[in-house]
Amino acid sequence: MPPVRAIVSLGSNIEPRAEYLAKAREALAAMPETRIAGMSSVEETDPVGVPDEFAHLKFLNQLIVLQTGLGVHDFSRRMHAIESALGRVRTVRNGPRTIDIDLIDFGGIRLDEPDLVLPHPRAKERDFIMKPLAEMAIEL
């Protein structure tokens, strides 16, 4: 399979936030047949849609563009494994997270499956995704 462009959003609101982003970038780049092709700047953002008790925990966000020979489902599984390896726990909906890795786009394909919807259904509503896309001159 020829390499495809995968756009991934990284976010962390548990310290050390910058370290979690760096480790996620390293782990993504270490996936088989995958390399980083571009990165946005890192930006601090307010949380969106979180419970009030977590509203003070600002995020560091970054968009990563990768080239990968992996299939979309394998890529997605590996992303979730990276989240788990970096201590992501999903006990509270929209709660604090060491790392959040979202697949925004994968080679322009459209999927609507229970565990994977592409392109990301809320990407265009989120400034922390749209601003870095504009910074890198990428359109969804």
Report residues per predicted region:
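A short linear-motif detector with a strong N-terminal bias
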Residues: E15-A22, A37-T45, I82-A85, G107-R110
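Short, surface-exposed acidic-centric catalytic microdomains
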Residues: K23-G71
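Short hydrophobic/aromatic beta-strand micro-patches
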Residues: S9, V65-Q67, F106
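Flexible, gly/pro- and Lys/Arg-enriched active-site loops
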Residues: V48-L60, L70-L140
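Short, structured patches in soluble enzyme cores that scaffold and shape functional sites
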Residues: L10-S12, T68, A134
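Extended accessory regions or peripheral subdomains of proteins
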Residues: P2-A22, E33
